[in-house]
Amino acid sequence: EGANSNEAKGMWFGPRL
């Protein structure tokens, strides 16, 4: 995982967390 994965996950996990 890296910046690329973090940005993709941020779309779903960002607003959820």
Curated annotation (Swiss-Prot):
Q: Which cysteines are joined by disulfide bonds?
A: none
- Chief subcellular location equals secreted
Q: Which InterPro entries match?
A: Pyrokinin_CS
- What is the designated name of this protein? Pyrokinin-5
GO MF term list = neuropeptide hormone activity
Against PROSITE patterns, the record matches this protein to: PYROKININ
Gene Ontology CC entries for this record: extracellular region
From what organism does this protein derive?
Answer: Archimandrita tessellata
